[in-house]
């Protein structure tokens, strides 16, 4: 074989390997996306079971304004449900108390200090 032929074969092989790598990466990304969608659907289903409609509505409004707080409260509620600590559905008043507790626990305290010269 001549050098140009070898170079052509090498390039062809490299292109084929790159194509396979890209396909496998795309497949992994798609699988991760599907897995996240399934997990999110399971979270929503669990929250539907443990929250009253009014509480779900309030949590949705909180999610619009403060997504991190809503996520923390959802995690807390799901943890309570999974450990069997919830005996009945959480109503709006109970959710308000939980929101306040989690908000107070995660609130950052800011202090402004002035340095005098």
UniProtKB/Swiss-Prot annotation:
- On whether Disulfide bond is a keyword of this UniProt record, the answer is no
Q: Which InterPro entries match?
A: DNA_bind_arc, PDCD5-like, PDCD5-like_sf
GO cellular component assignments: cytosol
Q: Which UniProt keywords apply?
A: DNA-binding
Domain of life, source organism: Archaea
The molecular function GO annotations come to: DNA binding
One Pfam family from the UniProt entry?
dsDNA_bind
The record's HAMAP family line, in alphabetical order, gives:
dsDNA_bind
Q: Which PANTHER family match?
A: PROGRAMMED CELL DEATH PROTEIN 5 (PTHR10840:SF0)
Q: Which NCBIfam families match?
A: PRK04239.1 (NF003268)
Family to which the UniProt record says this protein belongs: Belongs to the PDCD5 family.
Protein name stated in the entry = DNA-binding protein MK1619
- State the organism of origin: Methanopyrus kandleri (strain AV19 / DSM 6324 / JCM 9639 / NBRC 100938)
């Amino acid at each position: 074989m001549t050098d140009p032929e070898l170079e052509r074969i090498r390039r062809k092989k490299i292109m084929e390997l790159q194509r396979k790598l890209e396909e496998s990466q795309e497949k992994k990304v798609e699988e991760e996306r599907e897995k996240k969608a399934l997990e999110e659907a399971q979270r929503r289903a669990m929250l539907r079971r443990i929250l009253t409609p009014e509480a779900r509505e309030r949590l949705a409004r909180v999610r619009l304004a403060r997504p991190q707080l809503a996520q923390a409260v959802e995690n807390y509620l799901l943890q309570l449900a999974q450990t069997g600590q919830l005996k009945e559905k959480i109503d709006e008043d109970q959710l308000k108390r939980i929101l306040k507790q989690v908000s107070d626990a995660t609130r950052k305290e800011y202090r402004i200090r002035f340095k005098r010269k």
